[in-house]
A protein has these predicted regions:
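Alpha/beta enzyme core
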Residues: 9, 16-250, 254-280
Length: 280
C-alpha cells in the first residue's frame, strides 16, 4: 500500500527507457543546446523539476543555508548531502543527479575525495561537483580515472567565502581573469565533464564559454554561457534577500511546477538572465 501511495504522488513508478547522462548533456551543450541545472533537496521538488525538463538536479551544499538555516555552506557534511541525495533520487524521473562535495570532504587528500564521492554515488548521485580550479585538478583527475564523473566549479566558490572576504563578484581584474582561464583549462584537462562558473561579469562569462572545450554552466555569469544553474528557493521567490542574478519565476504562475517550467523555458530561449540580472 505504501509503495502504491508513493507512486501516485510522485508519478514516476516507471522510469523512462532513456535517462539523461552527464556526458550526453555535455555533448549537447557543446552543440549549442542550453543546459538547465537546478538545486533540489527532497523527493517532491526533485519530481517537479525533473518533470519540468531540468537536465541536472544539483543536491547543493546550499542546503546548509536554505534548508538548515546557516549563514554559509561550511557546516554541511557528506552525511547531509548523502541524505538529501537519496531523497532526490526517489523523486527523480530522468534528470542527472549531481552531488555537491561539501567543505572538508575532498581538500585534504584524493583518498578523502574518493570516499566522499563514493558515499554520494551510493546514495544516488550520478556525478559529483567540487569547487576549485588548478589546485583541485589532480583530485578531479583521480576521481575521473576511478569512474566518478565530475563537474568543476570556479569563480566565486562559496566554500572559500572567508578567503574572499564575503560573497563577492570575481574576475574584476586582468590578473583574476587570467587565473580563471588557467583554472578552466586545468579542470578541463583533468577530465571534468562541465564546469560551474559563479559570480563573474557577463563579458568574462561569455569569453570563457566561447573558449571552453566543456560546457560552462553559469550562475551570475551572464547569458552567453552553455547553461544556467539556480537555487530552487531563489527562482520561487522564497529568498528574503535574493542575489542580483535571481528572478522570481513563481510570479504570475499557479504552482511550483509552472514556475520551474518557466525557468527551464527562459534558459532554453536565452531570455534569462537579462541585462539587469548580470554583473558588468
Amino acid at each position: 500500500m505504501a509503495g502504491r501511495r508513493r507512486a501516485t504522488w510522485l508519478g514516476n513508478a516507471r522510469k523512462p527507457k532513456s535517462m539523461k547522462t552527464l556526458l550526453k548533456l555535455a555533448a549537447a551543450g557543446m552543440r549549442g543546446e542550453r543546459l538547465v541545472m537546478l538545486t533540489a533537496y527532497d523527493a517532491m521538488f526533485a519530481n517537479y523539476a525533473s518533470k519540468a525538463g531540468v537536465d541536472v538536479l544539483l543536491v547543493g551544499d546550499s542546503l546548509g543555508m536554505v534548508i538548515q538555516g546557516h549563514t554559509d555552506t561550511l557546516p554541511v557534511t557528506v552525511t547531509d548531502v548523502a541524505y538529501h541525495t537519496a531523497c532526490v533520487a526517489r523523486g527523480n524521473v530522468d534528470s542527472v543527479i549531481l552531488g555537491d562535495m561539501p567543505f572538508g570532504s575532498y581538500q585534504a587528500s584524493v583518498e578523502d575525495a574518493m570516499r566522499a564521492a563514493a558515499t554520494l554515488m551510493q546514495a544516488g548521485a550520478h556525478a559529483v561537483k567540487l569547487e576549485g580550479g588548478a589546485t583541485m585538478a589532480s583530485t578531479i583527475e583521480f576521481l575521473v580515472k576511478r569512474g566518478v564523473p565530475v563537474v568543476g566549479h570556479i569563480g566565486m566558490t562559496p566554500q572559500s567565502v572567508h578567503a574572499f572576504g564575503g560573497f563577492r563578484v570575481q574576475a574584476r581584474t586582468d590578473t583574476a581573469v587570467a587565473q580563471l582561464k588557467l583554472d578552466l583549462a586545468a579542470v578541463t584537462d583533468a577530465g571534468a565533464a562541465m564546469v560551474v562558473l559563479e559570480c563573474v561579469p557577463a563579458a568574462v562569462g561569455a569569453m570563457l564559454a566561447s573558449e571552453s572545450k566543456i560546457p560552462v554552466i553559469g550562475i551570475g555569469a551572464g547569458p552567453r554561457v552553455q547553461g544556467q544553474v539556480m537555487v530552487l528557493h531563489d527562482i520561487l521567490g522564497w529568498t528574503a534577500k535574493p542575489p542580483k542574478f535571481a528572478r522570481n519565476f513563481a510570479a504570475g504562475t499557479n504552482n511550483v511546477q509552472d514556475a520551474i517550467s518557466a525557468y527551464v523555458s527562459a534558459v532554453r530561449d536565452q531570455s534569462f538572465p537579462n541585462e539587469s540580472e548580470c554583473y558588468a
